[in-house]
Amino acid sequence: MTIKSMRRAYQVVKTVLQYGLDDLIPAKLKPWYFRLLRWSFFWLTNQHKDKVGGERLKLAMQELGPVYIKFGQMLSTRRDLLSDEWAEELAMLQDRVPPFDSAIARAQIEAELGAPIETYFDNFDDTPLASASISQVHTATLKSNGEEVVLKVLRPNVEEKVHADLLLMTQSAQVLETLLGHGNRLRPAEVVEDYRTTIEGELNLKLEALNAIKLRNNFIDSGALYIPKMYEEFCFTRLIVMERIYGVPVSDRAALEAQGTNLKLLAERGVELFFTQVFRDNFFHADMHPGNIFVSTEHPEDPFYIGLDCGIMGTLTEQDKRYLAENFLAFFNRDYTRIAQLYIESGWVAADTDLVAFEQAIKVVCEPMFNKPLDEISFGHVLLELFRTARRFDMVVQPQLVLLEKTLLYIEGLGRQLYPQLDLWQTAKPFLESWMAEQMGPLGMAKKIKKQFPYWTDKLPELPELVYDNLKMGKNFVNSQNQLLDRYLKQQQKAHKSNYLLITSAVLVICGSILFSQNATLWASYACIGIGATLWLLGWRSRPKNRKF
């Protein structure tokens, strides 16, 4: 460990102790060496005893900086692990940091371009349009055609800082997991690994550009979502250039009302967009918080969304999609047995899970939800409560489902903020039923056959050989089983013969001993003992030498 990393480790420990985060661990889970370590930092005391645990954690992450802020934001979406109070506190964390020097930004951009900025751009604005923990955004115009663009560039040395903090997080999570026990539902090491995957994806701007291009192509003819154009010739690992857009932040309801936006249509389109991305395209924007979503200013009566920041995207397997759709339909049909079966069939929980107990646990959680009208039931909270219940039955964390749950909660919150009367079930049910019918119907079967056709065409020439090999293998297996059976029967015959001789010898020896003790004729007693001894020797020599068959 370098001096620099040791200094950072001390800073983290200092912050943790001054915010009393160690006090949140139950005393029974603190072994003697943990208490000794805590005592060795006796001068660092809890300065925030008046604050609740969730607030202390939020403030500590805020003080530790950008990597921990983003980690806190990610944790706020893990409501299957945290209580609602803690999750809401962490959701308040803001990824806002002071901009870095524009001269450094220029140098970073020119290093990626391999030329001065003025070679390709005019009107480069040294004052950043926005600044976050990972990157910074500047505006300019393309020299070739005068189009307005934004340049997004990574912060200097951000990769080194992120990886150093991730290493500390991983080590801390391993210690915490040891204290809590590996069976604890929090599974800190698993959570940190999930975060590592997310944030490392954000460090590659080229990947973000490719994601944006794919999402843009998926909705190129859509009147519901617009993704800004990426200029691929200027997209690199540490720099991307995209079309500049103008819109109203989706969280600014007053501005949307002022321009006469059809909020009901906008809210319904948000739900439709989510299900289209998940079920039609299997490629969904997984970071749809209000800062990344804008609304068009043109045609407010027929509004569309503008999506930014495609660094975090989610995908599901075909199996996951089918189970998810069936889950929602089973929930609204109150078929809790089917929900439990789906979790087991999908492999999300172990096959040996007690189905009856699992079904009862799901029913206890879900049934009270139906005390509310259907239009007030939250899809996101349904999924969340099901995940929480499944975690009690050792559900393995599915990162793709965590992203989906987070996105669904964002979309629902957004939709109800725009239009409180939004009925998600009525909006989503036709889509889900149509998708399920398509998957199970002739068209769905034809698509699956078409998808698998190239594979089977490639394998077809090998089929006769595979059939022959399997038949030969089966024949050899039968022959080997027959040989084993013959060996087994012969060994059993030997064993029976040996046992017969040994038992007979024992009887004769006993009889000879009795005759001898009764002063009977000596030759009779000696004969019994002698024959018995001979039979014992024959029986011993005829026993099976190797009992393995």
Swiss-Prot record:
CDD domains to which the protein is assigned, alphabetical: UbiB
Keyword match Kinase: yes
Function text: Is probably a protein kinase regulator of UbiI activity which is involved in aerobic coenzyme Q (ubiquinone) biosynthesis.
Protein name (database record): Probable protein kinase UbiB
Pfam families: ABC1
Pathway: Cofactor biosynthesis; ubiquinone biosynthesis [regulation]
Cellular component GO terms held in the UniProt record: plasma membrane
Taxonomic placement: Bacteria, Pseudomonadati, Pseudomonadota, Gammaproteobacteria, Alteromonadales
Protein's UniProt keywords contain Zinc-finger: no
NCBIfam families named among the record's database cross-references: PRK04750.1, UbiB
Main localization, broad class: membrane
Residue positions of the active site: D287 (proton acceptor)
InterPro entries, per database record: ABC1_dom, Kinase-like_dom_sf, UbiB, UbiB_bact, UbiB_kinase
HAMAP family, per the entry: UbiB (MF_00414)
Coiled-coil stretches noted in the UniProt entry, renumbered to this chain: none
Domain Protein kinase: 123-501
Top-level taxon of origin: Bacteria
Residues reported to bind ATP: L129, A130, S131, A132, S133, I134, S135, Q136, V137, K152
TM region(s), chain numbering: 498-518, 520-540
